[in-house]
Structure formats: C-alpha cells, structure tokens
Amino acid sequence: MQRVARIDHPEVHEIVPSHHCVLRFRQRRPVRERGADVVAEALIAALEDADVSRWPPAWAVGDRNTELWAVSGELAFPLERSARHGRYVAVTCLSR
C-alpha cells in the first residue's frame, strides 16, 4: 500500500513519494527506529508539514525544471503533476 500525504493547498491536495524519494529521504534524514513503516510515517509527516511554492529554496536552485516544490525545514521535494487532478509526485528528496 502506497502512503499519501494530504495537504491543504489550492493546487496540491495529495503528494505521493516516489520510490527514489523514499530512498533519498532515508539517506538524508536518518530515522533512529527500525522498520519501513517508521520511515514512511516520517516522510509523510514531512510532506504534510511542507510549504508548497513555485520557488525552490535558494540552496536547491539548479537546472531542474520543476513547476512546484514542497519545502519542509531542511528538506525540499520537487513535485511533478500526476494524471489525477490535485495529486503530485515527490520525485526526490534534497537536503541543505
């Protein structure tokens, strides 16, 4: 079962982390407890706490063409639109 972050934003209602995003999140924000469920819960919490903007944080600026970003503290998630209205995919996890 895939976890989905639900947020209150005019364009983005749900964020689904890609497999690559989950792997990068595990590398960039180690979770002290064991188990995939603990990591998934921490990632969903970070996405639900994120501010969605068209502008990346200054430290994440690069040549990536991304329409929207979800930024949660020291983490940034570039978002790609999915086929479902209001649902976006977090393609990776970047950290400062």
Annotated model-derived regions:
Residues 1-96:
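Ribonuclease/tRNase effector modules and their secretory precursors
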